[in-house]
């Protein structure tokens, strides 16, 4: 049998073993081995011993690191192969061209740096190419995501800025931010992001803030309502015009981490450290929990309400013969938890799917506007894409999307345009053309992520 090592390699190995034994005060064993190998003292003087003293440990750790790298690469190859198995040249081409099928790919278009601490939240302007980022460094930064340039830094909070959101009535878009300093602040983008109002009322850190969309049933100030979640276990609804708290929602028994409004503004979905998710009907005079969802084994970090475009993919899981009407909201929801799992729920509070794959806390969720996919980010540094048409199968894993934990994820909101008048539809009176009630929806294929590495990454088509 031919030797595996060359004579020189064998000699280096022997000297490394002897040096290791000597360094660990196993002198008798070292001398015995040296004698059996016929290495005299001249061939293994103090200089040689010093040279080989740590070589064995270095070789060993190198092998371990290499083995870990090989396992990681094998895992990546497996994920890529799975993606290829589910794709054809036609579907890949269509995915690149069709916004409803677009999936982000590495590398990011921009990796934006300026923050001096963890980025906690990102939010896109509903019309312009601006994106806001909130950080533990107590600042908000406004970027141009198309150019990859920093536009301005907003200061005002005295502690970490936890969440940001753009919203408000058409023509009066505002930026809302919330902080560990117990306050919510409103900033005016049309006036150099001047702080126009500060909302105070929570008794602990404010962990999430969201504008409630236009069309909230029963809302007197539709388009000017704001929802917030706090460590004080409550949710609050605010009038952005006056800064007054209109309602306080009690029900959670621990820190409320996240809140998400339905597209019509009728419902709020909330979740937190009591490991539950609650769906609230805020259209009634005395809002109360409509549904409470139990099932996670650890604190919940995030939640999202599915768009109506996803109903066709999720309704078969409930046994429905046809999906609910698009006008119906909060039919399906998703939650992400520190138990490393994502759960998909229906409006009755039934868990339809449990998605497993992340190796650490799940920090943020975003449904694809096209409805077919759900995206998630985690402390395991990955961004994952789950295909709802395949019962939540993970079809893409973007590994090392950030250098450290990924804390936030946001999809740029679609742009809604009034449908133009055209040939065909008539209201039957004098042959006048009738304008469609359905606005034209333009999906923006842009995703932003932020993390503990203090970087804001932009993935765009």
UniProtKB/Swiss-Prot annotation:
Chain positions of WD repeats: 114-155, 157-197, 201-248, 251-290, 312-355, 357-396, 401-446, 448-461
GO CC annotation, single: microtubule
Pfam families: LisH_PAC1 (PF24951), WD40 (PF00400)
GO function term, MF aspect, one: dynein complex binding
Record localization: Cytoplasm, Cytoskeleton; Cytoplasm, Cytoskeleton, Spindle pole
InterPro entries: Dynein_regulator_LIS1, G-protein_beta_WD-40_rep, LIS1_N, LisH, PAC1-like_LisH-like_dom, WD40/YVTN_repeat-like_dom_sf, WD40_repeat_CS, WD40_repeat_dom_sf
UniProt entry keywords in alphabetical sequence: Cell cycle, Cell division, Coiled coil, Cytoplasm, Cytoskeleton, Microtubule, Mitosis, Repeat, Transport, WD repeat
HAMAP family: lis1
Subunit structure: Self-associates. Interacts with NDL1 and dynein.
Family statement: Belongs to the WD repeat LIS1/nudF family.
Domain notes: Dimerization mediated by the LisH domain may be required to activate dynein.
Name of protein: Nuclear distribution protein PAC1
């Amino acid at each position: 049998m031919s030797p595996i090592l060359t004579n020189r390699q064998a000699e280096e190995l022997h000297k490394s073993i002897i040096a290791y034994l000597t360094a660990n005060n196993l002198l008798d064993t070292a001398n015995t081995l040296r004698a059996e190998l016929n290495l005299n003292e001249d061939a293994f003087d103090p200089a040689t011993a010093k040279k080989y003293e740590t070589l064995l440990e270095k070789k060993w750790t190198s092998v371990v690191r290499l083995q870990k790298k090989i396992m990681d690469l094998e895992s990546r190859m497996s994920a890529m192969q799975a993606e290829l198995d589910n794709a054809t040249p036609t579907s890949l081409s269509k995915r690149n061209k069709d916004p409803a099928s677009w999936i982000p790919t590495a590398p990011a278009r921009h990796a934006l740096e300026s923050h001096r601490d963890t980025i906690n939240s990102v939010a896109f302007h509903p019309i312009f190419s601006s994106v806001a980022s909130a950080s533990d460094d107590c600042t908000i930064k406004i970027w141009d995501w198309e150019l990859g340039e920093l536009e301005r830094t907003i200061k005002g909070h005295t502690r970490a800025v936890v969440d940001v959101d753009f919203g408000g009535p058409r023509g009066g878009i505002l930026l809302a931010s919330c902080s560990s300093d117990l306050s919510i602040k409103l900033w005016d983008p049309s006036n150099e992001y001047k702080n126009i109002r500060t909302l105070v009322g929570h008794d602990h850190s404010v962990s999430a803030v969201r504008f409630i969309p236009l069309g909230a049933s029963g809302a007197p100030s539709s388009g000017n309502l704001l929802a917030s979640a706090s460590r004080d276990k409550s949710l609050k609804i605010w009038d952005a015009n006056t800064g007054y708290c209109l309602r306080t929602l009690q029900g959670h028994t621990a820190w409320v981490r996240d809140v998400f409004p339905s597209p019509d503004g009728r419902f709020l979905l909330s979740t937190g450290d009591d490991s539950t998710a609650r769906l609230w009907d805020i259209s009634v005079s005395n809002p109360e929990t409509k549904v409470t969802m139990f099932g996670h084994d650890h604190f919940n970090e995030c939640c999202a309400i599915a768009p109506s475009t996803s109903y066709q993919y999720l309704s078969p899981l409930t046994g429905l013969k046809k999906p609910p009407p698009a006008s119906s909201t909060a039919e399906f929801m998703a939650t992400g938890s520190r138990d490393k799992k994502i759960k998909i729920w229906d409006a009755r509070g039934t868990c339809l799917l449990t998605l497993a794959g992340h190796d650490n806390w799940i920090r943020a969720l975003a449904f694809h506007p096209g409805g077919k996919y759900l995206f998630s980010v985690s402390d395991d540094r990955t961004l994952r894409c789950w295909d709802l048409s395949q019962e939540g199968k993970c079809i893409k894993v973007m590994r090392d999307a950030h250098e450290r934990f990924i804390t936030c994820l946001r999809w740029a909101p679609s742009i809604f345009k009034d449908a133009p008048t055209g040939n065909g539809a008539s209201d039957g009176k004098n042959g006048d053309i009738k304008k469609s009630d359905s606005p034209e929806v333009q999906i923006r294929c842009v995703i932003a992520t932020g993390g503990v590495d203090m970087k804001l990454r932009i993935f765009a088509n």
